Swiss-Prot record:
SMART domains: PH. The gene is Osbpl3. It comes from Mus musculus (Mouse). One of its GO terms (molecular function) is lipid binding. Transmembrane segments: none annotated. This is Oxysterol-binding protein-related protein 3. Homodimer. Interacts with RRAS. Interacts (phosphorylated form) with VAPA. Interacts with OSBPL6. InterPro entries: OSBP_sf, Oxysterol-bd, Oxysterol-bd_CS, PH-like_dom_sf, PH_8, PH_domain.
């Protein structure tokens, strides 16, 4: 015990880059920051089993709950279990279980907080007294090193979470927790496919056979699970023998049971010896106290039976799941490579004929509507009483009428990617590409070529008649690019841990990162990406019912997150103070511009105008690194006005989290609640909940929303996945309000960019003369990264950052405060456009201004 006290917290919790001989001022500042607790390194070993630590701690409630609650914790052999009380721990009625050896542990001495970051959750713990804090940190450190040494010595035990020589060492709750984590990790590899070799699609994609043929990890997993299955069958026989022995000891003649001569200690059953040959009933020695030994031995048998049965059934279930999944994938590969049977060809021909006839009918309807719209003033406003389904099926002939099968709500949310039989609204030409199932992929290709090209042209023509008239000078483009000049760099050689280990719990927006970790877009351009589906606002501006308008505004707010699904592997450039960006899109009918209005704190403001809507927001992000994951917390409000009805909508943003920062396949999720209000009309409001993924569930990226009327009654319900599609209605009758555009070819090589994102940094000679020199497209480090010149991009990035620091120092020395050029601060501290950007652009006014040197 004295040895443990000598391992002082201040000596052992120092970050690897810090010296233990720091002066007192540095020690004081260290107490105010998060520090990582080091584990075993190199050839270090730790074989001494630490004592069990128990007691009450404060644990932060899991999202969405807030505050702290009191829980009883038990730390034994590197496993931290917790429940409401000690009695619940003893009864194995656990609330959770953490493998400390596999977690990243960080502490903050000033607030007496301990954070344990696993792959699935971040556990925030707090200790009331400093003495208890030091004691728990010391014990956690010892148990963590002991557990890491055990993992290093017996790596197989990490997968199965119990030792072959002592099954009773694993509590049932412990195994269930880890077993579910392992099953979850397998499901997540299918649920979060960005950039992963495990991603696949059913439609002749060659990635499917490649994944099956090169899946060494799955082969190893199958072999390991088969070994476990055989071993657990042997354990089952052992349990039956023990059960017989238990009934024997429970008989009245318990004192007559004999044991072998050399036996002098308590009975110990070895799980690797199922025949119980160490017991000999032929000797004449008996227990000195038979009833007491019988009671203790019976209790041990009951505990062992309870744990072993849970282990057996859990692993058998996992084994069956993996076997079934692999068989499905093998069948998929066989179907993918084998010729289609004649019956299938006949069915596909019928489907093709039906699709062509339907598309021809739709094309004729759209032509008539387009011809009528040219003869009329602004489109006639439908009657207010029409509901959303009637509007979608009637408005401009855009509905593809397919009846949704009468399935349960659960079956819909299980796989929305296969939910193509719903009644759907064509919001963009690319939306229809997903209307036919993957098995009919070649039918989709043919029908697209024959009719959907004409259909999309009609839709574009109709949009232009309704959209604003934009200046044509410098905006004519032949064709937008479909790829970047060079693919993204290989970042496997970048050591994120060496960069982030000293920044646990800190705001990462102030931490310099290597240019390889960036994508060739910056935050201002990311704000413009939120307008990729601006047609939802165009649609809302033509709907008379405020309740139905709210549905499309909510869908627009959700669609802003769709492009992030494939973008977890890189981060955007941070804009420098005074940097600007513009995006004029005639095809979408809006004009967008943005400016970095503040550097400390970093605030980006943007504004967009259209004949149908006005969009603006100012936002800043706080990034928190927690060891294995990073949270991105946005601060700011998004505004949209619809002049046709005098609506002014505003809403907040939700929290984003990138998982597996240091190792494994990174994936992103969004969670929290968006509250959408109409400031000029209180007849309705909307709440959209981004559901946090649970490691025991395969459902991820789901949203649920409700539109309420003035009395609080739910009028419309929204559901779907934020990266796929949004539906309005119930399980038996729903309307597809929005569907994400398909990804461009080769998107994995180009940072996971959508087609819209690929075009954001594009610059042609005509638009070059219209842009101010502060526009992001002139930024050299970002342009060099896009072109694949990593070394020169890093040099330019450091030069630009140094130049910004010098500008800030000069401003501070002269007492000058930076004044944004195109935005002003309103009375509620929000940044809004001052109306000068678009006016200056008309008359080439940017060339007449003095601009700061940003790069």
């Amino acid at each position: 015990m004295s040895d443990e006290k000598n391992l002082g917290v201040s000596q052992k919790l120092v970050s690897p880059s810090r010296s233990t001989s720091s002066c007192s001022s540095k020690q004081g500042s260290r107490q105010d920051s998060w520090e990582v607790v080091e584990g075993l390194r190199g050839e270090m070993t730790y074989t001494q089993e630490p004592p069990v630590q128990k007691g009450f701690l404060l644990k932060k409630r899991k999202w969405p709950l807030k505050g702290w609650h009191k829980r009883f914790f038990c730390l034994e052999k590197g496993i931290l279990k917790y429940a409401k009380s000690q009695a619940d721990i003893e009864r194995e009625k656990l609330h959770g279980c953490i493998d400390v050896g596999l977690s990243v542990m960080s502490v903050k001495k000033s607030s007496k907080c301990i954070d344990l970051d696993t792959e699935e959750h971040i556990y925030h713990l707090k200790v009331k007294s400093e003495e208890l804090f030091d004691e728990w940190v010391s014990k956690l450190r010892h148990h963590r090193m002991y557990r890491q040494n055990e993992i290093a010595m017996f790596p197989r035990d990490v997968n199965h979470f119990f030792s072959g020589s002592s099954v009773t060492d694993s509590a049932p709750g412990v195994f269930e927790s880890v077993s579910s984590r392992k099953r979850s990790s397998l499901s997540k590899q299918n649920s979060f496919p960005p950039g992963s070799n495990l991603s696949f699609s059913c439609g002749g994609d060659t990635r499917v056979p490649f994944w099956l043929q090169s899946s060494e990890d799955m082969e190893k997993c199958s072999k390991d699970m088969a070994h476990c299955h055989a071993y657990l069958l042997e354990m089952s026989q052992l349990l039956e023998s023990m059960d017989v022995l238990h009934r024997t000891y429970s008989a009245p003649a318990i004192n007559a049971i004999q044991v072998p001569k050399p036996f002098s200690g308590p009975v110990r059953l070895h799980s690797s010896n199922p025949n119980l040959s160490t017991l000999d009933f032929g000797e004449e020695k008996s227990y000195s106290d038979g009833s007491e030994a019988s009671s203790e031995f019976s209790k041990m048998q009951e505990d062992l039976c309870h744990v072993a049965h849970k282990v057996y059934f859990a692993l058998r279930s996992a084994f069956n799941s993996i076997s079934v999944e692999r068989e499905k994938l093998k069948q998929l590969m066989e179907l993918d490579t084998s010729p289609s049977p004649s019956a299938q060809v006949v069915g596909l021909k019928h489907a093709l004929s039906s699709a062509l006839a339907q598309n021809t009918d739709l094309k004729e309807r759209l032509r008539r509507i387009h011809a009528e719209s040219l003869l009329l003033d602004p489109p006639a406003v439908p009657k207010p009483g029409d509901n959303l389904a009637e509007e979608n099926s009637r408005d401009e002939g855009r509905a593809l009428v397919h009846q949704l099968s009468n399935e349960s709500r659960l079956s819909i949310t299980d796989s929305l990617s296969e939910f193509f039989d719903a009644q759907e609204v064509l919001l963009s030409p690319s939306s229809s590409e997903n209307e036919i199932s993957d098995d009919d992929s070649y039918v989709s290709d043919i029908s697209d070529n024959l009719s959907l090209d004409n259909l999309s042209n009609d839709l574009d023509n109709e949009r232009q008649t309704l959209g604003p008239v934009l200046e044509s000078s410098g905006e004519a483009r032949s064709k937008r690019r479909t790829s970047l000049p060079a693919p993204g760099p290989n970042t496997s050689s970048v050591s994120l841990w060496s960069i982030l280990r000293n920044n646990i719990g800190k705001d990462l927006s102030k931490v310099a990162m290597p240019v390889e970790l960036n994508e060739p877009l910056n935050t201002l351009q990311r704000l413009c990406e939120e307008l990729e589906y601006s047609e939802l606002l165009d649609k809302a501006s033509r709907i008379p019912s405020p309740l139905e308008r709210m549905v499309y505004v909510a869908a627009f707010a959700i669609s802003a997150y769709a492009s992030s699904y494939f973008r977890a592997g890189s981060k955007p450039f941070n804009p420098v103070l005074g940097e600007t960006y513009e995006c004029i899109r005639q095809d979408k009918g809006f004009q967008f511009f943005a400016e970095q209005v503040s550097h400390h704190p970093p605030i980006s403001a943007c504004h967009a105008e259209s004949g149908n809507f006005v969009f603006w927001q100012d936002v800043r992000w706080k990034n928190k690194f927690w060891g294995k994951s990073m949270e991105i917390v946005p601060i700011g409000t998004t505004h949209v006005t619809l002049p046709a009805f005098g609506d002014h909508f505003e809403w907040n943003k939700v929290t984003s989290c990138i998982h597996n920062i240091l190792s494994g396949q990174r994936w992103i999720e969004h969670y929290g609640e968006i509250d959408i209000k109409n400031l000029n009309d209180d007849s309705c409001h909307c709440k959209v909940n981004f559901i946090k993924a649970k490691y025991w569930s395969t459902n991820a990226h789901e949203i649920e929303g409700t539109v309420f009327d003035r009395s609080g009654k739910a009028v419309h319900r929204l559901f779907g996945k934020w990266h796929e599609s949004i539906y309005c209605g119930g399980a038996s009758s729903s309307t597809c309000v929005w569907r994400a555009n398909p990804m461009p070819k080769g998107y994995e090589q180009y940072y996971g960019f959508t087609q819209f994102a690929l075009e954001l940094n594009e610059m042609d000679p005509l638009s070059r003369s219209l842009l101010p020199p502060t526009d992001t497209r002139f930024r050299p480090d970002q342009r060099l990264l896009e072109e694949g010149n990593i070394e020169e991009a890093e040099v330019q990035k450091q030069r630009i950052e140094k130049l910004q620091r010098e500008r800030r120092r000069v401003l501070e020395e002269n007492g000058v405060e930076h004044q944004p050029r195109f935005f002003r601060k309103s009375s509620d501290d929000a940044w809004v456009s001052n109306g000068t950007y678009l006016e200056l652009r008309k008359d080439l006014g940017f060339s007449k201004l003095d601009h700061p040197v940003l790069w």
